[in-house]
């Protein structure tokens, strides 16, 4: 009789017998504006080809990822306030793992931080978060969902 508690599973990695072609590209643009503003953006792409039918490559990379940001390193209150906001997007893709194959959905997030400078003591106070809209997403098939992360920090002797 089969006993699920005594089963042993094996995963054996092998190389493809034919030439596999993978390629990627990226483009980034930062533009400095007046009054300490900066606009930034980037887009990246990756692909793989030349695989035999049914070969599992474990490539696990979305075809496209992009982000756009707006930053200001000093405004108001004698240029003591600063902020950064970044919107991120990632395509969905098929995730291939040793425990299973499944679809990872596309997702987008918004990261933001507000900074206050304390020049007399060379310090910063920051309040922000990653994925501030708390939109849950996965980066791998079977992995836990990722939500928002929020923080307040104090940094001493930074400038």
Predicted regions and their residues:
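Glycine-rich phosphate/pyrophosphate-binding loop
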Residues: 1-2
């Amino acid at each position: 009789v089969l006993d699920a508690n005594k089963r042993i599973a094996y995963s054996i990695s092998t190389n493809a017998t034919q030439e596999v072609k993978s390629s990627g590209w990226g483009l980034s643009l930062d533009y400095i504006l007046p009054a300490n503003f900066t606009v930034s953006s980037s887009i990246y792409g990756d692909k793989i080809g030349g695989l035999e039918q049914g070969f599992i490559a474990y490539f696990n990379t979305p075809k496209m990822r992009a982000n756009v940001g707006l930053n200001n390193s000093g405004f108001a209150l004698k240029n003591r306030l600063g902020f950064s906001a970044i919107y991120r997007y990632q395509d969905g893709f098929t995730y291939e793992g040793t425990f299973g194959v499944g679809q990872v959905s596309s997702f987008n997030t918004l990261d933001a931080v507000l900074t206050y400078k304390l020049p007399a003591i060379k310090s910063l106070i920051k309040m922000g978060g990653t994925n501030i809209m708390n939109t849950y997403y996965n980066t791998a098939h079977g992995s836990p969902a990722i939500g928002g992360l929020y923080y307040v920090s104090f940094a001493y002797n930074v400038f």
